[in-house]
Amino acid sequence: MKTVTEFQNKNILVLGIAKSGYAAATLLQKLGANVIVNDGKPLAENVLAAELQAKGMDVVCGGHPLELLERNISLVVKNPGIPYSNPILVAAKEKQIPIVTEVELAYRISEAPFVGITGSNGKTTTTMLTFEMLKEGQKHPVIAGNIGTVACEVAQDAKENEVVVTELSSFQLMGVELFQPKIAAFLNLFEAHLDYHGTKKEYGLAKANIFKNQTENDYSVINADDADVMALSAYSKGQKVLFSTTKEIEDGACIKDNALYFKGEKVVEVGDIVLPGQHNLENILAAMSIAKLLGVSNKAITAVLKRFTGVKHRLEYVTTINNRKFYNDSKATNMLATEKALSAFTQPTVLLAGGLDRGNEFDDLIPYFKNVKAIVTFGQTAPKLVRAAEKAGLDTIESVDTLDEAVVKAYAHSTDGDVILLSPACASWDQFKTFEERGDIFIQAVHKLI
């Protein structure tokens, strides 16, 4: 960990606890700050808050009183999930108090360089692929961010010869000031999180923060097939490395002659890749580009791609019952992810979908229903999904209250050779704490059928 003195004796407000807030508060105390921790949940229900209080921190729970900002606050470190429209953040901004997220702290203390990966879809898969390729290539990666350990915990122990590989959301990237990844990858942009950002434009600009401090000594890995990403790459001063699944890229990554190429050199045959789905070729090209930029050999990259079958909750094969294959794609929290999941199968498919209503309609899914024989909807968006299914002319459309019911109904509507796919196209927070919990409940419900 770097020697950092900028926080000593400063009053710093950590807003929202959870894992990242707990880690940030603990780190700041270690760095000599006077830490004030604030969380909306009452102290009696807040185990982490009680632990921080026991460490000697000033902990205020049960709301976000504006009076906290009268304590000569030098910096606010916010939980990514707390929107900037929250009154305490609006007031902090008016007072010109800097507002950052925990990943910014991680960067400031880390001796190791960062690789940052963002995009609407494919972040987790690309992050895991990158980690595995760097590990196989003996580049000493450590994984942090939305997957793995909280970034500022990892950064405390990361050494100069290591690489911190981070999956970064728009929520996290809105709160960076100095964050400068050695390599920044922007995979794609799809209309999402409008309840948080308001517009696709603002959402895209938040993502583009991954580029804002890069220099000509850094690299920006960019999806040449995504017009929005290409436009936002103008914010990068780094060396641009493009990847594409549709056209040849001489100075980047592409597919030609049924193989993956990087800067004109064949790296791996498509036939050696075990990860299913056409969309995953984009993720592989991005990860491969990062690995090659960091000096990983073709042999190491190929070894990973011959064994890497995917990440949990992302087109995860669950089991086969009476020749019906079940897949858990609970991480599909928006339409684009579900479109890609549906495109991965040619068999008749029974789709389970639904979740938190963020204001979207689902007509964009209609062209992808060509192999969908039945849909079972649940959650807040069930009526909207039913409307889209009716427009698509599906014969079998059902709505149920719970995911357990949805699994039973989906199996009842299936026949020999079908795929039964959970790909919700929505966030999980209307009925579940996380998409992981939703996926686990789906898997449990499937096993009850056996």
Swiss-Prot record:
One of its GO terms (biological process) is regulation of cell shape. It comes from the Bacteria. ATP binds at residues 119-125. The keyword Lipid biosynthesis does not apply. The keyword Cytoplasm applies. It is found in: Cytoplasm. InterPro entries: Mur-like_cat_sf (IPR036565), Mur_ligase_C (IPR004101), Mur_ligase_C_dom_sf (IPR036615), Mur_ligase_cen (IPR013221), MurD (IPR005762). It holds the Pfam family MurD-like_N. One of its GO terms (molecular function) is ATP binding. This is UDP-N-acetylmuramoylalanine--D-glutamate ligase. It comes from Bacillus cereus (strain AH187). The gene is murD.
